[in-house]
Amino acid sequence: MIHVEQTFEENLFTIKGQIAHERVDSAGDTVTRGVRVARGMPLWSERLELQGKADLVEFRPEGAYPVEYKLGRRAGIHADLQLCAQALCLEEMLGVAVPRGAIFYHGLHRRYEVVIDQLLRDTTTRAIEAVRGMLRSQRLPPAPNDARCPSCSLLNACLPSVIGEPARVRGLQGALFRPLALSQEDGDA
């Protein structure tokens, strides 16, 4: 919704995420325990037509190691896909392999290492292509209406409980697009 319909709303969770990212989002390089650390590093890939920003990249002796910061807890593959996209950008930009990275969960104060294997690379590439197709078509996928919805900042714009019920949608569409003359005959006006 953010990119297709230019809709964004703040809520407690988006604000907490901004606060959690304040330090890591301040662009710049430091050296920690002999390792160069780049914060807020711009990333891009001409091949994948991506551009973005890494929360943090550690330049270890064995190579670049992206670290993505997340507010909540580990759930699903979405953060892994984001981290992999960053690794793919780093590989293209630097001409080096990026075989692993990490996701730091702020609430848990813990890092989880992610292996950037071929399956994750292929899944990430397919996800990028699917998003690109959605942006081109300007059509959003159906709202999932699941346990994540009550915490989502876009809940009131998305209305998953309404959109997720086809009969209700048809009824609303019928009422919305009923000609005025028919409405007046029915005594609705």
PLM features per residue range, with description:
Residues M1-Q6, E92-A97, P160-P166:
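Short helix-capping/linker segments at secondary-structure and domain boundaries
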Residues T7, A127-A130, M134, A175, ...:
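Residues that form generic nucleotide/phosphate-binding pockets
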Residues M1-A64, R73-R74, L176, D188-A189:
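Metal-dependent nuclease catalytic cores that hydrolyze phosphodiester bonds in DNA/RNA
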Residues R139-E185:
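Cysteine-cluster motifs in flexible loop/terminal segments that predominantly coordinate metals
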Residues V24-D25, V31, D80, E92, ...:
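Metal-cofactor-dependent catalytic cores
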Residues W44-G52, V57-Q138, P142-N145, P150-N156:
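Nucleic-acid nuclease catalytic cores
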Residues N11, S45, G76-I77, D117, ...:
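Alpha-helix initiation/capping motif
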